[in-house]
Amino acid sequence: SKLEAERLLRGLARERGLRHLVCRFGTIFGTSPGMRFHTAVNKFCWQAVFGQPLTVWRTALHQRRPYLDLADALSAIFFFIRRGRFDGRIYNIVSRNLTVADIIAMIGTHITAPAIDYVDNEIMNQLSYEVSSRRVQVLGWQATGSLENSIAATIALLRRAGGRP
């Protein structure tokens, strides 16, 4: 697991002097050559463009979660590498904290009234939470990614791949 990997890094730092840091990324969204469609933003865009109802856990509609633009993830990695800042600390890397309802509303500005299929099954993570990137922001890194722009780019890409206009 991710936490086990963090413990391993701390142990290697103690035992062998490994210089490291940990980036805890929000849920990634955005276009890339190897896009994945199992997380909320990309999955909902895919479903909406191809005329499928968005599958939403009813209990998750208003839960807040941390999201991260792919470009922001890369810029954070480069930020740390360029500064050689391997201080063993944990850094949350987040573009924005949003609800599923927020994401659906943004998709709705590009695709009129996407259908929603509410799922009443229990989800693995029932928690609603926000994550702060303050620790890395005070060092000078800022998220610049835009969920709105990323949704527009994802929808445009999927439409070119054969989705509905």
List the model feature ranges, each with a label.
Residues 52, 57-165:
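C-terminal substrate-binding subdomain of Rossmann-fold SDR/epimerase-dehydratase oxidoreductases
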Residues 7-65, 70-75, 107-108:
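NAD(P)-dependent short-chain dehydrogenase/reductase
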Residues 4:
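Active-site His/Glu-centered metal-binding helix of metallohydrolases
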Residues 1:
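Active-site helix of classical SDR
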